[in-house]
Amino acid sequence: MDCKRRQGPGPGVPPKRARGHLWDEDEPSPSQFEANLALLEEIEAENRLQEAEEELQLPPEGTVGGQFSTADIDPRWRRPTLRALDPSTEPLIFQQLEIDHYVGSAPPLPEGPLPSRNSVPILRAFGVTDEGFSVCCHIQGFAPYFYTPAPPGFGAEHLSELQQELNAAISRDQRGGKELSGPAVLAIELCSRESMFGYHGHGPSPFLRITLALPRLMAPARRLLEQGVRVPGLGTPSFAPYEANVDFEIRFMVDADIVGCNWLELPAGKYVRRAEKKATLCQLEVDVLWSDVISHPPEGQWQRIAPLRVLSFDIECAGRKGIFPEPERDPVIQICSLGLRWGEPEPFLRLALTLRPCAPILGAKVQSYEREEDLLQAWADFILAMDPDVITGYNIQNFDLPYLISRAQALKVDRFPFLGRVTGLRSNIRDSSFQSRQVGRRDSKVISMVGRVQMDMLQVLLREHKLRSYTLNAVSFHFLGEQKEDVQHSIITDLQNGNEQTRRRLAVYCLKDAFLPLRLLERLMVLVNNVEMARVTGVPLGYLLTRGQQVKVVSQLLRQAMRQGLLMPVVKTEGSEDYTGATVIEPLKGYYDVPIATLDFSSLYPSIMMAHNLCYTTLLRPGAAQKLGLKPDEFIKTPTGDEFVKSSVRKGLLPQILENLLSARKRAKAELAQETDPLRRQVLDGRQLALKVSANSVYGFTGAQVGKLPCLEISQSVTGFGRQMIEKTKQLVESKYTVENGYDANAKVVYGDTDSVMCRFGVSSVAEAMSLGREAANWVSSHFPSPIRLEFEKVYFPYLLISKKRYAGLLFSSRSDAHDKMDCKGLEAVRRDNCPLVANLVTSSLRRILVDRDPDGAVAHAKDVISDLLCNRIDISQLVITKELTRAAADYAGKQAHVELAERMRKRDPGSAPSLGDRVPYVIIGAAKGVAAYMKSEDPLFVLEHSLPIDTQYYLEQQLAKPLLRIFEPILGEGRAESVLLRGDHTRCKTVLTSKVGGLLAFTKRRNCCIGCRSVIDHQGAVCKFCQPRESELYQKEVSHLNALEERFSRLWTQCQRCQGSLHEDVICTSRDCPIFYMRKKVRKDLEDQERLLQRFGPPGPEAW
């Protein structure tokens, strides 16, 4: 529904045609969604049909239950019937999806120690077996701990005394909190470890390992030790903590060698099944000691993904006119759900729960309720019956789930908010805020649903893709190539209050809104990619969706450090230091009608770190090399003056991690090339991508000044080597490939950026450029230490180099006789901070220049578009600009167009006004001279409805001018480009619409003009007395214009009917992401005006008959 698309109600994907023309070709075929619903009955395997009806996981007494009876549930919706399992003879093997912990009492285990206290930390792993059974594994016996260096003179005799003192200090500190049921410190042990920060040359030193009773005691224990704890005979030394800021789950996974989403095995006889007094709704619930858990690395057969159950859902609300739905007052009228078993091609479940009767939908089960309370409880019971592992949808995190929970609370449906897998644990809503320089501030909500993974596709797209608009319609068109009907929230109430057929139409629409996120999840491989990223980095799946980047590197660092007896210190950061970034070789701007070879350093920053052994563990402090007596060939001095020992002295942790990641990626790519199974290919592709991203993020981890372990010396040394290598590559290429050395021409590096150089070898064919590019890459690589390697990547021909970070060209990579694509970097063709007209014009101009090799045609086309703009012939959908509302109006330093418009819209209609985090669509309208641009922003629909004039001069000067000059100056010359494009006859004719509201119109009187000569007439007729002889001719002309408008409107109407999947129902779509919507609105208004004009001719006279 439209009311939940508030995360960016901006304009959509740029249309295929510039200049506002109607799409005569390539019209979308009628929607097949409703027909596809009928496939449900054909996609279930025979064995599912033969299974006996299984036992429904009954809700906890007093918490859930309700209106969704077992008779309403198709047996195929439930999990497979649980087979008999004997823990004494059969192992339990499952893929874990989520790991968390709680504090409780642990039941006794075979061969395990008896619990010594009532409250102990217990880890909880939720997962799925190969047969599809849901599992909850309670893992006991693991306690939180951290390290600290032993003070000078500290011996074994001080251990008990320090433990007593620390216990007493923690007990005093925790007096105001929960009372401890036993000692806070379980043990303190002496051990030999070494800090990973810096090379000291003395090897391991004495450390204390402090084990605590509960994870929540880590913070106070660390603080008290930093302040100082009395040790008899040693005074009150201060203790520096190591690994005290590591999450309890990460600590356990590192120690147990468990990675995210891998397969766990519980050996026979080592675990106990909970048959009674289960704490969760999972089919299998077991207890096991942490040391008995076998973790399988995700390789070979253990790379597979279990048959996870994925649920996608969408809700519809009946809001009041002009007011955004509020859960305290506005009812939930429909909840539609689709279920998919991972690995199967089609959903196995389609369910529409509706308030009031609804006509049947082919291929879907429809259940109707008279009371909203019953509808809500039925969906909650359905969740427990279906038992999804992953829940997805579009904006479910900030709208659907919070609305359902809040609405149930308002209606006092007390048994509703138990949507997780833990018995009696409520699903609560918590506000969350994220802010960064890249994305600004984003407010969101977090809904606890323990045991189920939430994957909101809107949040995924916001994090991973830069789009012009993030409405479901826009992203579906961008990634899936299909549009959807978008119904305004005010119309939804009318459909609900209609009849069974209107409610059926609403249910089909709601089912489509639940179906598209599922399609996006599969098409973008979101689940597979995140599972593989969790496996590669070693963190739980949920961390990837809710946490930042650093935890992924910390996990890998801890694993590698543990094997070598190294510890990670707790570093306090200020975040004030900065360093010089990568080198950009000054571009030789111009239009190159010769092949330009691009040479690229493969994994540049990881390669530098490996080649030069750059790591925390190899860093030498100033003067340390001399103090340690290191020989000159045992350490290096980086271009920034920092020193690191070579791998012959000590192999760094980071280089080892990077080697493992890159070698694993190489293996994954080799397996991918041989694999034929589509599911295995998806997993392998996701794995190689996760390995690549993880390798590249290691450098960013060292450079993050506010982070777990920042190290300016590493990050600035990496960029220093990178700058040096780019410059050396330029020198090597230009010195070898010369006429003196027998080549056809002197090579020239025309541009270099971070990890690549663009070379002009002076040859005329792409094949020759490819050959020389490969030769040059191999020759330059021989001058750098392994594994640094320069590779031939592609050839641009022709190539338009505009400035730093801005260029375009036809890309050849695999074949020399056909280009792969037109590649643009940094140009308005790929940017989203301007109107679609700019992207379309830049793209079409580049296509004429690069593909057609017709610069004159490109100039002529640009002049035509500018003329159309000034004459008001461009469709308004092409002129819409979108900007994200990242802060409140008061927080912006200056006035912003989109912020001011949002405030005005809020005063007009608070319900439909944009909110924080939305992308605000606007156009710039004409106003008095000197009015600031931010005051001229207006809602595109408001502009259409009130015929407000567009400020075409603004679009020419502020939107089109600079992008066009950037493209054409290298071709026409700096002085000539402006005079040819922005001056001349094509800019002299302008058309300005007359506004229907505001301004001087309030003080003027409208008078009729003759349709023929435009002179003022003092009667209601159509023509003056001088044009009366031509009245029939003028009438025919206006009738012809009316017919053309009617035909255009019919074509647009039919196109919208095809999109909505019905050719006999009214079009109610209001998708602002669709250019057809604006065209339809404009033509409807033009039709009304034309009909009024024809009425001035009056009824036909007797002579007409």
From Swiss-Prot:
Catalytic activity: DNA(n) + a 2'-deoxyribonucleoside 5'-triphosphate = DNA(n+1) + diphosphate
Cofactor(s) the protein requires to work: [4Fe-4S] cluster
Compartment list: Nucleus
Gene3D superfamilies: 6.10.140.1540, DNA polymerase family B, C-terminal domain, DNA Polymerase, chain B, domain 1, Helix hairpin bin, Palm domain of DNA polymerase, Ribonuclease H-like superfamily/Ribonuclease H
InterPro entries the record matches: DNA-dir_DNA_pol_B, DNA-dir_DNA_pol_B_CS, DNA-dir_DNA_pol_B_exonuc, DNA-dir_DNA_pol_B_multi_dom, DNA/RNA_pol_sf, DNA_pol_B_thumb, DNA_pol_palm_dom_sf, DNA_pol_type-B
Residue numbers bearing the Omega-N-methylarginine modification: R19
Record PROSITE patterns: DNA_POLYMERASE_B (PS00116)
Intervals of motif CysB motif: 1056-1074
Region (Disordered), start-end ranges: 1-31
Annotated residues for binding of Zn(2+): C1010, C1013, C1024, C1027
GO terms, biological process: base-excision repair, gap-filling; cellular response to UV; DNA biosynthetic process; DNA replication proofreading; DNA synthesis involved in DNA repair; DNA-templated DNA replication; error-free translesion synthesis; fatty acid homeostasis
NCBIfam families: pol2
PANTHER family per record: DNA POLYMERASE CATALYTIC SUBUNIT (PTHR10322), DNA POLYMERASE DELTA CATALYTIC SUBUNIT (PTHR10322:SF23)
Subunit structure: Component of the tetrameric DNA polymerase delta complex (Pol-delta4), which consists of POLD1/p125, POLD2/p50, POLD3/p66/p68 and POLD4/p12, with POLD1 bearing both DNA polymerase and 3' to 5' proofreading exonuclease activities. Within Pol-delta4, directly interacts with POLD2 and POLD4. Following genotoxic stress by DNA-damaging agents, such as ultraviolet light and methyl methanesulfonate, or by replication stress induced by treatment with hydroxyurea or aphidicolin, Pol-delta4 is converted into a trimeric form of the complex (Pol-delta3) by POLD4 degradation.
Free-text note regarding domains: The CysB motif binds 1 4Fe-4S cluster and is required for the formation of polymerase complexes.
Task of the protein: As the catalytic component of the trimeric (Pol-delta3 complex) and tetrameric DNA polymerase delta complexes (Pol-delta4 complex), plays a crucial role in high fidelity genome replication, including in lagging strand synthesis, and repair. Exhibits both DNA polymerase and 3'- to 5'-exonuclease activities. Requires the presence of accessory proteins POLD2, POLD3 and POLD4 for full activity. Depending upon the absence (Pol-delta3) or the presence of POLD4 (Pol-delta4), displays differences in catalytic activity.
UniProt protein name: DNA polymerase delta catalytic subunit
Source organism per UniProt: Mus musculus (Mouse)
